[in-house]
Amino acid sequence: MTESSIHDPLTIRRLYGRQQGHSLRPKQAELVETLLPQLEITTEQAVSATDLFGDDRPLEFEIGFGKGEHLAGQAMMRPDHGFIGCEPFLDGVVGLLTHIDNNQIKNIRLHRGDALDILEQLPDGCLDRAYLLHPDPWPKARHAKRRFMNHGPIGLIARKMKKGGEFRFGTDHPIYCHWAMMIMGQRPDFEWLAQTPRDFLQRPEDWPQTRYEKKAREKGHEVWYFRYRRV
């Protein structure tokens, strides 16, 4: 590994934090045992709309889906699209499986692990939308390279998106907000869609609220919603 690659966020594969929290309840354990194997994407398989869903439907991708509220909501709004979600933590995976089971959602596939691994497997120019909502802000300057919002990962997202596709990013952390605006402002492959401040201070109607966002609002935090078009 070269000196430059050591500092390239695409080479960072360490996951910080616990991958499992509390013990699973019987129903949750059943979902992991029976439903997860039907929906799980591995790093060894082919990953395309046809491979995952049997047809060439539009694809959307969420990086770190948390407990799955947003991904499930988007999938229910557009049942003719295919949705891929990646989340390393079992509690989050169980949350999404619960949404899928309760609502009989058929158009989601998921990966328990690093989103970059699956992004790299996708065909170039295949994604209609990509989502990065409330990622860990890593607020200390010395941890900036751990932020997903860096040129390495964003460049990979750009390569996997269709021209005219949309990348959405949300955060309630001011340091991450400013950092994201700096990174995205340096990229000629994305166009910020905001016309007025209201556009990134108010959640769009087709942007389901996450549990994390709700908690942030309850704490009195401002939340910022960014939409970018792939050009």
UniProtKB/Swiss-Prot annotation:
HAMAP family: tRNA_methyltr_TrmB (MF_01057). It holds the Pfam family Methyltransf_4. This is tRNA (guanine-N(7)-)-methyltransferase. It is an enzyme of class 2 (transferase). Belongs to the class I-like SAM-binding methyltransferase superfamily. TrmB family. The keyword tRNA processing applies. GO terms for cellular component: tRNA methyltransferase complex. One of its GO terms (molecular function) is tRNA (guanine(46)-N7)-methyltransferase activity. InterPro entries: SAM-dependent_MTases_sf, tRNA_(Gua-N-7)_MeTrfase_Trmb, tRNA_methyltr_TrmB_bact. Its EC number is 2.1.1.33. It comes from Zymomonas mobilis subsp. mobilis (strain ATCC 31821 / ZM4 / CP4).
